[in-house]
């Protein structure tokens, strides 16, 4: 493993969403302006994210993480006896939807902070609206570095594409010399690939073949055959879980036996990829099998509640809600109070990072990544080969 990369430092998960239950705690619609500021009533946070559409798979992950956090918070008395509620609006992770949702939230005095959107593009389209209104936009899955450049009310506990892709290229270069890369035909995919390509060149990692792919394609074999025939030691996929599962299955079907980097650290990726997932390496910052006490405890509470292991995105949602509620405790239940608490610094307790501080770019400044692999159908820490 490269010297500048920690043993517990790696794996690139990236975000999608399944339909949410109408009776979920996410879809409470009873909040009004009377809950604003420190006036009593419920503490209301807005959620802009996909409940339907192409990114719907991740909605279930968010829902479960939010629901667990809400149930625990409110069972413990909320904040000074005030119940915590989420007001969810379905954006389909579409910038055309996220902007009117932002306008709706800023006009609702009850909403004191916003969580989302899922994709950086959908979040960034709405940032100006939140910034002008002084409403914190907490883009907890937004890895585009430009997201937090939209204003001082844009905050994200998500690590940037530069952070992920640079370290991914460095880690891969420690064991491989020649690779093929496929990446999503999207703003996120192109940006991720540009960063990865530059980092690979600096690390001496040769990209023998590169190609964009469509996220909703069912047959990637025409591209994958070319990727295979370029003679790589590994194929790197920059994308999401559903497309990653199809890619690794089809790679094995066409006879590629080298290393696969990609997919996503979710139960659904394992299910969709089947036996082809074995040996996959993913770059992440949270591992379900992590033996830290905080992760073990979270996993148990989550599984007791939902009957299955959490995904990384459930942990992201759980942490995001708890960080914002801690900001409410520190600064008060107002838009200004949340912003002041985040701006005042200090350490924030999470499942995925342990404790961390926000850096000057309003992102985590002192965390590491962890490479994970699939072994016997289970995610475990990966070692450099």
PLM segments and residue spans:
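Extracytosolic ligand-binding ectodomains
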Residues: 2-15, 20-385
């Amino acid at each position: 493993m490269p010297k500048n990369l920690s043993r517990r430092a790696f794996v690139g998960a990236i975000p999608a969403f399944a339909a949410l239950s109408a009776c979920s705690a996410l879809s409470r619609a009873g909040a009004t302006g009377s809950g604003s500021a420190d006036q009593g009533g419920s503490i209301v946070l807005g959620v802009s994210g996909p409940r339907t559409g192409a990114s719907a798979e991740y909605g279930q992950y968010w829902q479960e993480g939010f629901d667990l956090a809400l149930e625990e918070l409110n069972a413990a008395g909320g904040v000074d006896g005030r119940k915590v509620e989420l007001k969810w609006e379905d954006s389909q992770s579409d910038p055309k939807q996220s902007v009117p949702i932002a306008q709706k939230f800023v006009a609702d005095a009850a909403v004191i902070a916003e969580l989302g959107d899922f994709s950086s593009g959908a979040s960034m389209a709405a940032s100006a609206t939140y910034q002008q209104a002084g409403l914190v936009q907490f883009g907890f899955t937004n890895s585009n570095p430009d997201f937090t450049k939209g204003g001082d009310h844009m905050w994200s506990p998500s690590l940037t594409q530069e952070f992920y892709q640079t370290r991914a290229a460095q880690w891969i270069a420690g064991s491989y010399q020649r690779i093929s890369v496929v990446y999503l035909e999207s703003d996120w995919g192109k940006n991720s690939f540009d960063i990865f390509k530059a980092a690979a060149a600096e690390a001496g990692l040769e990209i023998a073949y590169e190609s964009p792919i469509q996220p909703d394609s069912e047959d990637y074999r025409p591209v994958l055959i070319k990727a295979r025939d370029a003679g790589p030691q590994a194929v790197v996929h920059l994308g999401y879980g559903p497309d990653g599962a199809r890619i690794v299955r089809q790679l094995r079907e066409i006879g590629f036996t080298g290393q696969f980097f990609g997919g996503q650290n979710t139960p659904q990726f394992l299910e969709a990829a089947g036996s082809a997932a074995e040996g996959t390496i993913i770059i992440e910052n949270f591992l379900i099998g992590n033996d830290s006490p905080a992760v073990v405890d979270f996993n148990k509470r989550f599984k007791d509640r939902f009957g299955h292991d959490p995904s990384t995105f459930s942990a992201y949602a759980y942490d995001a809600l708890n960080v914002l509620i801690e900001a409410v405790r520190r600064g008060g239940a107002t838009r200004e109070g949340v912003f002041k608490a985040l701006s005042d610094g200090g350490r924030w307790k999470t499942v995925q990072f342990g404790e961390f501080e926000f850096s000057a770019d309003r992102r985590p400044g002192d965390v590491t990544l962890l490479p994970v692999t699939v072994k016997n159908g289970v995610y475990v820490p990966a070692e450099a080969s």
